């Protein structure tokens, strides 16, 4: 889910028992906030006196305000539809009732996906005061602008690519340390790193050829970094043409074998190798060592 906030005249659409409901209202709005709220579109209006003179002080305030306003509009229509269709045919899929929609206003934090929340926090730390403006195209699943970044920015590209977004979402609980090769800063998530690249208009020309890899968007500053990435992350995924275009010689990137004879694991990345040794073999309370101790005791 990718929220988007706009200072616009919004067209809020929802569905009730397969019937499309629509309300036009000059409000701040939040894109994709719930189960049945599919699309919001807007275009800036000059001289619209109904718009507030100033933005809320924080991003979460913006989202909460737009959520409450949008729910007020949609819930009214949903309540009318719910009253008129209280008896539905048997087997019809249950729909979200207006009171259930209204009750969701306090769940805003849980509705925002973790990667987007990381970016909100990153923007707040940087003292950002973003305005999120969406285009007037209604048939789209994501906003045209994410946190004030244009559509061609790294952040927007990450969120507009379903395969890349799926890869990021699958690994969102695993936080790493991403080093910027242009400065000394480090970042806990890929999205924060992408926001940093956008902040300084940094473009890295060497892109990963794997379709679902985030680094096809973020790229690398030098070809050696790309080759190292592909050798450690995508061995087995690269076809012959990709290896030729990368000038990749796999033998230059040998695997690291676990030093413990009883363990036969091999690692392509040095950090993964060190983490394995520290957590599995040098940790007396690891599951591996506990099982090994039990086996040795049984053989006595």
Swiss-Prot record:
One protein family per Pfam: zf-C2H2
Return the InterPro entries for the record. Answer: Znf_C2H2_type
UniProt biased composition (Polar residues): 80-90
Q: Which residues form the signal peptide?
A: none
Subcellular locations according to the entry:
Nucleus
The UniProt keyword set, sorted, is:
Activator, Cell cycle, Cell division, DNA-binding, Meiosis, Metal-binding, Mitosis, Nucleus, Repeat, Repressor, Transcription, Transcription regulation, Zinc, Zinc-finger
SMART domains per record:
ZnF_C2H2 (SM00355)
Sorted alphabetically, the Gene Ontology BP terms of this entry are:
cell division; G1/S transition of mitotic cell cycle; meiotic cell cycle; negative regulation of meiotic nuclear division; negative regulation of transcription by RNA polymerase II; positive regulation of invasive growth in response to glucose limitation; positive regulation of transcription by RNA polymerase II
- Disordered, as annotated region: 80-100
A GO cellular component annotation in the UniProt record: cytoplasm
Q: Which Gene3D superfamilies match?
A: Classic Zinc Finger
Enumerate the residue ranges forming zinc fingers (C2H2-type).
178-199, 206-234, 256-281
Single annotated GO MF: DNA-binding transcription factor activity, RNA polymerase II-specific
Q: What does this protein do?
A: Involved in the control of meiosis. Represses the transcription of the IME1 gene thereby inhibiting cells from entering meiosis. But also activates the CLN2 gene thus promoting mitosis.
- Name this protein carries in UniProt: Zinc finger protein RME1
Species of origin: Saccharomyces cerevisiae (strain ATCC 204508 / S288c)
Q: Which gene encodes it?
A: RME1
């Amino acid at each position: 889910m990718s929220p988007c906030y706009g200072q616009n005249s919004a067209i809020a659409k929802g569905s009730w028992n397969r019937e499309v409901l629509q309300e036009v209202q000059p409000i701040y709005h939040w894109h994709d906030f719930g189960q049945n709220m599919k699309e919001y579109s807007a275009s800036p209006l000059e001289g619209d006196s109904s718009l507030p003179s100033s933005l809320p002080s924080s991003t979460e305030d913006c989202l909460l305000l737009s959520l409450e306003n949008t729910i007020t509009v949609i819930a009214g229509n949903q309540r009318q539809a719910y009253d008129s269709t209280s008896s539905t045919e048997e087997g019809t899929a249950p729909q979200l009732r207006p009171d259930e929609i209204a009750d969701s206003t306090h769940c805003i934090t849980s509705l925002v996906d973790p990667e987007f929340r990381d970016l909100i926090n990153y923007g707040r730390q940087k003292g950002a005061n973003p305005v999120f403006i969406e285009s007037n195209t209604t048939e789209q699943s994501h906003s045209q602008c994410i946190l004030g970044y244009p559509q061609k920015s790294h952040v927007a590209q990450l969120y507009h690519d379903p395969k890349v977004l799926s890869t990021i979402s699958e690994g969102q609980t695993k936080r790493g340390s991403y080093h910027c090769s242009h400065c000394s800063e480090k970042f806990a998530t890929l999205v924060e790193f992408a926001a940093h690249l956008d902040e300084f208009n940094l473009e890295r020309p060497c892109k990963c050829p794997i379709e679902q890899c985030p680094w096809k968007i973020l790229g690398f500053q030098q070809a050696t970094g790309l080759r190292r990435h592909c050798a450690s992350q995508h061995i087995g995924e690269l076809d012959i043409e990709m290896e030729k275009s990368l000038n990749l010689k796999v033998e230059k990137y040998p695997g690291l074998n676990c030093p413990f004879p009883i363990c036969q694991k091999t690692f392509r990345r040095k950090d993964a190798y060190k983490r394995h040794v520290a957590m599995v073999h040098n940790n007396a309370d690891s599951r591996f060592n506990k099982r090994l101790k039990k086996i040795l005791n049984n053989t006595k």
